[in-house]
Amino acid sequence: MTFSLAVPPLFAALAPARRILIAGAGGGFDVYAGLPLALALRANGAEVHLASLSFSQLELIDQESWADRDVAAITPDTASPDWYFPERTLARWLAAHDMPSTVYAFPPLGVRTLRAAYQTLIERLDIDAVVLVDGGTDILMRGDENALGTPVEDITSIAAVTALDVPIKLVTCLGFGIDAYHGVNHVQVLENIAALDRDGGYLGALSIPGSSREAVLYREAVADAQAATPERPSIVNGQIAAAVGGAFGDVQFTRRTSGSTLFVNPLMAIYFTVDLDTLAARCLYLDRLENTISRRQVISRIEAFRNEIATTRVPRVYPH
């Protein structure tokens, strides 16, 4: 597909889609990073559904909330004793704003089982575009970097979706720099983006205007989630929301980051988007995960790959 500077490639790529699934790739609050995109797409007339690879105790929800095997349809009224429930928190916020309020949730799974769950949901909703959203950029790691961040859920999501027959499959990242806490070298992130560009798989960067409707509502949703989950607010989305609001530097908003120096900055408010299949093709260990059923299997196979790899790329300091 040929893109133009006049139209953001992210929106150009999704223009033919009728029904779009935006799914948090890394679990937990990652789905919130897709909210500005979802709001913009809905304003343009697209039908958008939200999904999340959940860290909540989905086994505790009522049976009526299960749409199918390994696919829960979380609504504002979904009952659960689990206090950490980002999907329900988001569903309630959406309902309060008179928006479609179902957030689909997948339990932690291996590649084969998550792929089956995605296939079920895609068929159920007649989806023709899937966008995996990552809060941070460690989803762009290919395996030979100095550190991979927290790859388990991200790579499981990529491996699950890349094999599905869906016309449009994208990955977008919001929160550049956040994964430094987990050892990610962001020069290597930029190196990977450049390689994806050479392969024709980079759809550019798109900043969220701080005064836009999408930005205002996103900040409101993040604040609502922080209030609903005071013991475990999203560090990732808290920093992104601060960046989207024009904040800079060591912006503290939770005791969870006390003792750490944050670096909130405008790069965190930019979507970096790539073609999902191109990204999957560059992963050095994706084939090892193909037959996994459980999350534990994914973890052990990533660990085995990292133990076997002869050398990793030497991290570099950003020179500017």
Residues covered by each model-derived region:
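Glycine-rich nucleotide/cofactor/substrate-binding loop typically near the N-terminus or early
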Residues: 42-43, 48-105
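Internal, conserved structured core segments that host functional sites
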Residues: 101-164
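A glycine-rich helix N-cap at a beta->alpha junction
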Residues: 66-90, 190-220
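Cap/lid and interdomain-hinge subdomains that line or gate substrate/regulatory clefts
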Residues: 81-112, 133-135, 169, 176, ...
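Histidine-anchored nucleotide/phosphate-binding helix
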Residues: 31-50, 154-163
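C-terminal accessory domains and tails appended to enzymatic cores
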Residues: 226-320
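Short, glycine-rich nucleotide/cofactor-binding loops
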Residues: 22-32, 146-149
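Positively charged, low-complexity intrinsically disordered leader regions
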Residues: 1-20, 25
